[in-house]
């Protein structure tokens, strides 16, 4: 079973992503509400894929991504962004993200992105 780490400062978004990925046979090995905690969980568990919110308090998604990639250049990170954040998505792809989904997204969009990344 493929493992997923969810990093998002929104409890509701973490819950939504968790439900979607578990319905599709993935195992959520960790959830983090901030980048620093997410990086620690990544280093501890080395999940198959990470969903990472672009805009978060304290440490944003781009900085979190850079630190994950610095630790593991092969990390498979899917950025989660809101409409109008396309500039951040370009930065994320340049920084090593393997994919992105735009909120609001559905199960099919998330799973298609996972399939491409994995």
Explain the meaning of each model-derived region:
Residues 11-30:
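Two-component/phosphorelay signaling modules centered on CheY-like receiver
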Residues 34-37, 60-63:
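Acidic catalytic/metal-coordinating carboxylates
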Residues 45-51:
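Active-site beta3 strand of CheY-like receiver
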Residues 57, 85:
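The feature encodes the CheY-like receiver
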Residues 105-114:
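C-terminal output helix
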